[in-house]
Design a protein with these regions (language model features):
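Active-site-adjacent structural elements that line small-molecule/cofactor binding pockets in enzymes
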Residues: 1-156
Length: 156
């Protein structure tokens, strides 16, 4: 993938896929970061030496600061095991945010963060080692987006 992103022609023969003289056109104008969205030991071992960022879904860490901190510790350990300095990796968390009553179309085993509590939650996530947060709004609509944007504008 890195060779394709660097503008190289690539030939690959795999068990399930192959590519012959593949090239990515137009070529990227900058380095494209690669993010891993996995917490599994096998995939971490395979991918951590090659990625720029790691992301986890809210259900993987219980949508809590403590859960993220614990998982971040596991990821840092996996980085070391893979021969990677954890500080070189961007650490990212998806956060489930409920606006108002929400839509009800979300997992019942994970408590959402209320929009009004989001600024403090994001500060605490940063203290726990999150470099970025990807917000998953419930409901996902214009009103919710505006309300959340207004709630966190002072963090920018």
């Amino acid at each position: 993938m890195r060779l394709l992103l660097a503008g190289e022609h690539v030939t690959f023969e795999g068990e399930f896929h192959s590519a012959h003289d593949a090239v990515l056109l137009p070529p990227p104008h900058r380095t494209v970061p690669i993010m891993l969205g996995s917490n599994g030991a096998r995939m971490l071992g395979i991918a951590l030496p090659h990625v720029d960022a790691w992301n986890t879904w809210f259900s993987s860490y219980g949508n809590t600061v403590e859960g993220f901190a614990n998982l971040r510790g596991d990821i840092d350990g996996a980085c070391v095991k893979a021969g990677r300095d954890p500080a070189e990796l961007t650490h990212s968390a998806c956060v489930l945010v409920q606006v108002g009553e929400g839509s009800g179309a979300r997992p019942s085993d994970v408590s959402p963060v209320a929009a009004k509590d989001l600024p403090s939650h994001l500060r605490l996530l940063a203290e726990a080692g999150a470099d970025e947060a990807i917000l998953v709004l419930d409901p996902i609509d214009e009103r919710s987006t505006r309300q959340v944007a207004n709630a966190i504008v002072d963090l920018l």
